[in-house]
Swiss-Prot record:
Pathway: Cofactor biosynthesis; thiamine diphosphate biosynthesis. It comes from Methanococcus maripaludis (strain C6 / ATCC BAA-1332). Binds 1 [4Fe-4S] cluster per subunit. The cluster is coordinated with 3 cysteines and an exchangeable S-adenosyl-L-methionine. It is an enzyme of class 4 (lyase). Belongs to the ThiC family. Substrate binds at residues 65, 94, 123, 162, 184-186, 225-228, 264, 291. PANTHER family: PHOSPHOMETHYLPYRIMIDINE SYNTHASE, CHLOROPLASTIC, THIAMINE BIOSYNTHESIS PROTEIN THIC. GO terms for molecular function: 4 iron, 4 sulfur cluster binding; carbon-carbon lyase activity; zinc ion binding. Keywords: 4Fe-4S, Iron, Iron-sulfur, Lyase, Metal-binding, S-adenosyl-L-methionine, Thiamine biosynthesis, Zinc. Its EC number is 4.1.99.17. It catalyses: 5-amino-1-(5-phospho-beta-D-ribosyl)imidazole + S-adenosyl-L-methionine = 4-amino-2-methyl-5-(phosphooxymethyl)pyrimidine + CO + 5'-deoxyadenosine + formate + L-methionine + 3 H(+). This is Phosphomethylpyrimidine synthase. Pfam families: ThiC_Rad_SAM (PF01964). Zn(2+) binds at residues 268, 332.
């Protein structure tokens, strides 16, 4: 049984009750959304995961990516990133490790958080194939599905799988070349496999078998966008749309089998094209939850891509995206460090909150009203408690204090609020 099959059968699970309470929503309404496939609750039956709802009519959620690379392997560092994710309000974590003992790293990450954990299994497949055969492209079907099954048994809650990269998709890419080709790592593995062997993508060819594996453990399928644009010039091209059409067809198959599914979206999109991309996806994929990376709205800001992504993420969430994958200042430059994780997470949470306010979400507005009340009362402690990041503003206030404990050092004696407040008392 999965959350979706239970919902279709009219069964109210404990996870549904928890999410409904968290979202301030009637549980029957939530159950109906899950039954239709408009909301997912990624929770593997083998793990005690905190239930998190992702989809329409819910708060916008934020994911943190972390993980090792062949150039930097430090489990302690990754666990520190997990700690930061827990502390600053991530809704999910993806382990994208490609260096070191991948099962051991994943085990430690899972052990140190109760947040939903996602992976991209093809990374481990590629690492295993390289170790065994010397090349990633020599991976085979057995290796692919063995890794997926092993990760499902370990408790992974959602998996990014690039099932929409097919021989047809690759043909479209070759006939309509783009500036930066394939920038998705998992997408590149499978594109290279198809081109070298002239074989169909096993994840697409054996999709029914894949669904059986995922359904057994109630792993949510996150359909990866292997043809996402890697620069603004490539946005919304034929390869991207061809893959999206295939993903829409696969969403239908998931729903027929009762497998929870969400769809991943583009990474580099000009601001004026974001709304159209969201509406195309929501239409083609019939309101499946949409998971976007950014989108990044300019390619000119390496070192500041947490900002470019937050700008794009706000509009994306207002226009239909349900799940924002954070982007850190290190994007396009190096592996993220602990501080990068915090900066990226807070930036994406700002985008999510701004979007939820724009959509009129009641819980988002309650927080805004609480902050306004605290500021009006000069209650600095309360302001910091409500803030998305309590530590930074508290430290900043201590650095240059005001002589008046109610004011701040910007205005001091000339505080507008205090001035009008004093006049009102006379």
């Amino acid at each position: 049984m999965t959350q979706m099959t239970d919902a279709k059968s009219g069964i109210t699970t404990e996870e549904m009750k928890f999410v409904a309470k968290e979202e301030g929503m009637d549980v029957e309404t939530l159950k109906n959304l899950i039954a239709k496939g408009y909301v997912v609750i990624p929770k593997n039956v083998n793990r005690n995961t905190k239930p998190v709802g992702i989809g329409d009519n819910l708060r916008t959620k934020v994911n943190v990516n972390l993980g090792t690379s062949p150039d930097f392997i430090d489990i302690a560092c990754e666990l520190k990133k997990v700690e930061i994710s827990n502390k600053y309000g991530a809704d999910a974590i993806m382990d994208l490790s490609t260096g070191g003992n991948l099962p051991e790293i994943r085990k430690e990450i899972i052990k140190n958080t109760n947040l939903p954990i996602g992976t991209v299994p093809i990374y481990e497949v590629g690492a295993d194939a390289k170790a065994k055969y010397g090349r990633v492209i020599d991976m085979d079907e057995d290796l692919i599905f063995n890794v997926i099954e092993r990760q499902a048994k370990e408790g992974v809650d959602f998996m990014t799988l690039h099932c929409g990269i097919t021989k047809q998709t690759v043909s479209v890419l070759n006939n309509d070349p783009r500036k930066m080709g394939v920038v998705s790592r998992g997408g590149a593995f499978l594109t290279a496999y198809i081109m070298y062997h002239d074989k169909e993508n096993p994840l697409y060819k054996e999709f029914d078998y894949l669904l059986e594996l995922l359904k057994e453990h109630d792993v949510t399928l996150s359909l990866g966008d292997g043809m996402r644009p890697g620069c603004l010039q490539d946005n919304t091209d034929r390869a991207q749309i061809q893959e999206l059409i295939t993903l829409g067809e696969l969403v239908d198959k998931c729903r027929e089998k009762g497998v929870q599914v969400m769809v991943e979206g583009p990474g580099h999109v000009p601001y004026n094209n974001i709304e159209a991309n969201m509406k195309i996806q929501k239409t083609v994929c019939k309101n499946a939850p949409f998971y976007v990376l950014g989108p990044i709205v300019t390619d000119l800001a390496p070192g500041y891509d947490h900002i470019t992504a937050a700008i794009g993420g706000t509009l994306a969430a207002v226009s239909g995206a349900n799940f924002l994958c954070y982007v850190t200042p290190a994007e396009h430059v190096r592996l993220m460090k602990e501080d990068d994780v915090k900066e990226g997470l807070i930036a994406s949470k700002i985008a999510a909150q701004a979007a939820d306010v724009a959509k009129g979400h009641e819980l988002a507005w309650k927080l805004e009203k609480k902050m306004a009340d605290a500021r009006m009362k000069h209650d600095w402690k309360k302001q910091f408690e409500i803030a998305l990041d309590s530590d930074k503003p508290r430290k900043m206030r201590e650095e240059i204090p005001s002589k008046d404990e109610k004011a701040c050092s910007v205005c001091g004696d000339y505080c507008a609020l205090l001035m009008v407040e004093e006049l009102g008392k006379r």
